[in-house]
């Protein structure tokens, strides 16, 4: 009976991706709670109710439409200040995120790349937030800050429309940061901090960790070498690989990396045995050819 062995480095890379996704979901949930902070204020005093609530009054019951006025006022009050649990946007959004997480796990088990899955998921989450959490229209300050204690009027605590707009955009910003900056805005600073790029590099290296690549030997022969012979931690290999020109951009785009060039680069910097066995002049030409071929695709 055959057994399937999973490389520990691949597991670590996958766990790092899942932790990054969980942190993004937590950040989005916190922003949703901030956006709904104005729904959790203190009870509004009767003397400071909105103008449309003035229709609720006591009389002798002779008015034929007294019941209708009361029902209209009561219904509008419930619409403004109460929300059913089934209609709570945060409750529905939590269920949506749970389904998204299950879908991500299924896609990763089927062999799809995490960077591709996450970029698609981010777009779906942004669309969901934009549709289900639109910015509320601006209201007058009298409708939001009519709370008093004794004779003193409390200070305005409800965020302005511009503040609410910036808060609602935090979810989009968090999701965009987690998936990496757009290709047109790619810069060296982003390359150093983009965890999704490191995860993609680690994933591709882990897949070919034991594969042997051909290098020119000093003895006019062929030198076979692989990542295992480096005797290095996968995280250290990834950090060194990011210094190879063009590798971070390829990883960001989800393209295939020139792994032979990456291996040669890392081995020249960290393996004395490799330095003694390889023909450095021919190696430089091979590495440059690999880079040109992969970056031009």
From Swiss-Prot:
Residue segments, region DYNLL1 and DYNLL2 binding: 138-172
Pfam families xref list: PP_M1
Effect of residue 169 to L: In strain: Isolate SAD Bern, Isolate SAD Bern original var 1, Isolate SAD Bern original var 2, Isolate SAD Bern original var 3, Isolate SAD Bern original var 4 and Isolate SAD Bern original var 5
One Gene Ontology MF term: RNA-directed RNA polymerase activity
GO cellular component terms attached to this protein's record: host cell; host cell cytoplasm; host cell nucleus; virion component
Top-rank lineage group of the source organism: Viruses
Result for mutant: residue 177 to T: In strain: Isolate SAD Bern, Isolate SAD Bern original var 1, Isolate SAD Bern original var 2, Isolate SAD Bern original var 3, Isolate SAD Bern original var 4 and Isolate SAD Bern original var 5
Start-end of Basic and acidic residues biased regions: 140-157
Positions occupied by motif Nuclear export signal: 49-58
Keyword Nucleotide-binding among UniProt keywords: no
Entry keyword annotation includes Nucleotide-binding: no
Gene Ontology BP term (one): symbiont-mediated suppression of host toll-like receptor signaling pathway
Polar residues: compositionally biased ranges: 158-170
Post-translational modification: Phosphorylated by host PKC and by an unknown kinase.
Modified sites of kind Phosphoserine: 63, 162, 210, 271
Role summary: Non catalytic polymerase cofactor and regulatory protein that plays a role in viral transcription and replication. Stabilizes the RNA polymerase L to the N-RNA template and binds the soluble protein N, preventing it from encapsidating non-genomic RNA. Also inhibits host IFN-alpha and IFN-beta signaling by binding and retaining phosphorylated STAT1 in the cytoplasm or by inhibiting the DNA binding of STAT1 in the nucleus. Might be involved, through interaction with host dynein, in intracellular microtubule-dependent virus transport of incoming virus from the synapse toward the cell body.
Family, as annotated: Belongs to the lyssavirus protein P family.
Protein name in the entry: Phosphoprotein
Species the sequence originates in: Rabies virus (strain SAD B19) (RABV)
């Amino acid at each position: 009976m055959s057994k399937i062995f999973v490389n520990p480095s691949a597991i670590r890379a996958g766990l790092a991706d899942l932790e990054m996704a969980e942190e993004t979901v937590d950040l989005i949930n916190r922003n949703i709670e901030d956006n709904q902070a104005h729904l959790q204020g203190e009870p509004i005093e009767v003397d400071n109710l909105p103008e449309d609530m003035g229709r609720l009054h006591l009389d002798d019951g002779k008015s034929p439409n007294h019941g209708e006025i009361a029902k209209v006022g009561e219904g509008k009050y419930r619409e403004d200040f109460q929300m059913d649990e089934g209609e709570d946007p945060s409750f529905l959004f939590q269920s949506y995120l749970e389904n998204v997480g299950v879908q991500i796990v299924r896609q990763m088990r089927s062999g799809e790349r995490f960077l591709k899955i996450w970029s698609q998921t981010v777009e779906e989450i942004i669309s969901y937030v934009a549709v289900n959490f639109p910015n509320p229209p601006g209201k007058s300050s009298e409708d939001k800050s009519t709370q008093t204690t004794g004779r003193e009027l409390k200070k305005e605590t409800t965020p302005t429309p511009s503040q609410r707009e910036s808060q609602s955009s935090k979810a989009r910003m968090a999701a965009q940061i987690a998936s990496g900056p757009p290709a047109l805005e790619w810069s060296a600073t982003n390359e150093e901090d983009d965890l999704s790029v490191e995860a993609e590099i680690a994933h591709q290296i882990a897949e070919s960790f034991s594969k042997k690549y051909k290098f020119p030997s000093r003895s006019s022969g062929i030198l076979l070498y692989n990542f295992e012979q480096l005797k290095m931690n996968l995280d250290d290999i990834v950090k060194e690989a990011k210094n190879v020109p063009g590798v971070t951009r390829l990883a960001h785009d989800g393209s295939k990396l020139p792994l032979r060039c990456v291996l040669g680069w890392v081995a020249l910097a960290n393996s004395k045995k490799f330095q003694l066995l390889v023909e450095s002049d021919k190696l430089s030409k091979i590495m440059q050819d690999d880079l040109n071929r992969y970056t031009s695709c």
